[in-house]
A protein has these predicted regions:
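N-terminal ligand-binding/catalytic initiation module
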Residues: 1-83
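Hydrophobic/aromatic beta-strand patches that form the interior of the parallel beta-sheet core
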Residues: 34-36, 86, 142-144
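Short, ordered loop/turn segments at secondary-structure junctions
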Residues: 38-39, 64-67, 88-91, 146-148
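Gly/Ser/Thr-rich loops at beta-strand to alpha-helix junctions
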Residues: 63-70, 91-92, 122-127
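Short, acidic/small-residue loops that bind anionic groups at enzyme active sites
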Residues: 80-94
Length: 176
């Protein structure tokens, strides 16, 4: 429901994207991947389907599931399966962003604890990027969505993920 640049295009239309990602797994990681697109958006149905087929796989790579549903699905699968679960939209993006930030800070001679980071878009990738840069030492991070800066006390356009985000970022409660 969240194919990059295409949005919610449905499972049949998403299949070529997933097949391409499987090719990348094989080419660059030597991993035989199998694309599976589901025709449901219900988190419970997605979790149940993956649990039911997981015995045949050594790991699960979640892809292109919209927020906030993707967070619930990933968490439940990590708790309920005994194989690795990876959500590429979150963690793949976050690792690349952290590497870029570390290298940029080396070039400009700044320390990670001294920078202010602004994240535009608090979906799967934005939240994961925020978490990884905070774990690396960023103290001042502000996330923005279509309503503006996310801060503790904001009421408009919030959900449970943005509530967590508001409690854990934007220490000076900047608005705008």
């Amino acid at each position: 429901t969240a194919v990059l640049g295409l949005g919610d295009i449905g499972p049949a239309a998403a299949m070529p994207v997933m097949e391409g990602k499987c090719q990348l797994f094989k080419e660059f990681g030597g991993v035989d991947a199998f694309p599976i697109c589901l025709s449901t958006k219900d988190p419970h149905e997605i979790v149940q389907t993956i649990k039911n087929i997981s015995v045949a796989f050594g790991g699960i790579n979640l892809e292109d599931i919209s927020a906030p549903r993707c967070f619930e699905i990933e968490e439940r699968l990590k708790e309920e399966l005994d194989i690795p679960v990876f959500h590429d939209d979150q963690h793949g993006t976050a690792v690349v962003v952290l590497a870029a930030l570390i290298n940029a800070l080396k070039i400009v001679g700044k320390k990670i604890k001294d920078v202010k980071v602004v994240v535009n878009g608090i979906g799967a990738a934005g939240v994961a990027c925020s978490k990884i840069v905070m774990a690396a030492g960023v103290k001042n991070i502000i996330g923005c969505d279509t309503t503006g800066a996310i801060y503790e006390g904001r009421q408009e356009n919030m959900n449970w993920v943005k509530d967590w985000y508001a409690r854990n970022t934007n220490p000076t409660k900047e608005e705008g």
